[in-house]
Amino acid sequence: LSNAKNCILAQHCSLAGGAQCTKLCGSYIATHGLNGAGGRVGAANLPSGYRGLTLANSPARTDQASIYRALDTYVKTFVRQFEESPEEPIKSLYLYSAGPGTGKTTTAAAIIGEYIVRHYIGSIQRNRQALDRPAYFLDVNAWQTLYTEFNRPKVPDDIAEPAARQYYAQMQHAKAAPFAVLDDIGVREDTEGFRSDLHSVINYRVTNDLITVYTSNVALKDLGTVLRETTPRLIDRIRDRCIEREFVGISHRGLKRA
């Protein structure tokens, strides 16, 4: 049986669907791991339901057709990651909608898939070693839950310490990855300490010109209010490097994914 449906490399692979297209394929293992939950996709920290997504198979593609047409062009710029001084750097993205369930997170996950594919194939074509973690997905809400877990009063050490280690590991991965998704940065209920850490991640990525896909429930012009920015400097720097896209339509949250 062909393994093509499980592999994000399939649409670019001449062996896809043939006799050599198995779970023992070296490129499949490098991308997805021997068990299908590892490799570079696993290292990206994508939630399990989003790990096989690309722009081609994304369930949000139909409802957000105009955005996806633009994204089909956008992901072609990922080849610039191999240029030392590209004339036009790869832009970051800011995806937002007022309501939930319009496909922002699904789309962001699909874009990570596209980046991993292009990084892996492009590295091989140039006789380079692909990075073990070229891209990283930070679920800001889940990250905040970890923060709360080790900052509550009287939390037992055996609970607080693993949560703290996981929290700071995710923070470092989100800073260091050449490409990252910061999912749902418009969190409204937070503490000064958590907000400071989120600012640190965003500021590090912006300062170092790292490609970032932000998803949010507020437009970029309103993000400063949500993040309680006293000066517009950080938001202005995000805007300078970002393409902003608004997702429209009704929520599909809770419906079975295609």
What are these regions (language model features)?
Residues 1-80, 84, 243-245, 249, ...:
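A short, basic N-terminal segment
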Residues 67-72, 98, 102, 113-176:
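Short glycine-rich substrate-engagement loop in P-loop NTPases that contacts/grips substrate
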Residues 48, 127-130, 233-240:
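Short, conserved catalytic or adaptor-binding loops enriched in Gly and charged residues
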Residues 78-91, 123-129:
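Short helix/loop segment immediately N-terminal to the Walker
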Residues 59-62, 97-98, 146, 186-190:
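Surface-exposed cleft-lining segments at the edges of enzyme active sites
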Residues 86-109:
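Walker A/P-loop nucleotide-binding motif
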Residues 90-94, 134-135, 179, 211:
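Residue-level preference for the first positions of well-ordered beta-strands
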